[in-house]
Amino acid sequence: MPQVQVKMRLKKIKKSIMITTLIGLLVTLSLAPIIWELITSFKLNEDILKIPLVYFPNQITLDHYTQLFTTHPFWRYIINSAFVASTSTILSLIFGTPAAYALARLNPWGSKIIISSILIITLFPGILLLSGLLEIVRFLHLGNNYLSIIIPYSAINLPLTILVLRNFFKQLPKELEDAAKIDGYNTIQMLLRIILPITTPALITTGILSFIFAWNEFIFALTFITREEMKTIPIAVAQIGGTTEFEIPYGPIAAATMISTLPLMLIVLFFQNKIIQGLTSGAIKG
């Protein structure tokens, strides 16, 4: 009996070591690009271009960060990205939440067809909309107008918002709505006063995913926004140039990458528990 227990314990230890090693490897692979960019952003130009590579420099510098804010209106780019991403996220939640609730709880006619259509739409990349949107923007004279990117961002995020929130709404107990109806609540009052307060994890999850997409989107912003003071961070980072046309400014690009990534990292870290709840809740039922 003791031998069997020893073998079982050794087996558990081996399994634990394997799982820990695998997780450590995955974490390392995931963090390696970020760590490399972070180190590069603090390197001197000589260390960045030195061969063999200097992995950990003896001297660090903040010149690349100060250069961003002295030679470029980088704070303006951050504010632009925050405004566009926040507005498009709010719009996608405003329109997506009632649609998801209707599909999950009210069972309208043709709901299965609607859901299937939403799933099919998610299979197509947003870039396919570019030529059509370009004609619409020209016709409505929306060039260099934030509406030309806010509306497409909201529309592209709508399917994700509807699908995630629908799965969350479907697992809510029907007794909540029955009790609300007895108290005299109509559908809109039920949604605003009862359903939404208990669906915070799902709302935060879909909101953050929508925000990240809008923050990082490049093609639409590059096409529809050309005025310097209206550009978003991805465009600003892509257009960082060196002192000559042959120079690649690795340091400033790395610094800009870290600055543009930091807000997203902080948001995800702050709301990580809500994100996990929101993503797993729809997988339990529905």
What is each stretch, according to the model?
Residues R9, K15-G286:
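A structural signal for multi-pass alpha-helical bundles of membrane permease subunits
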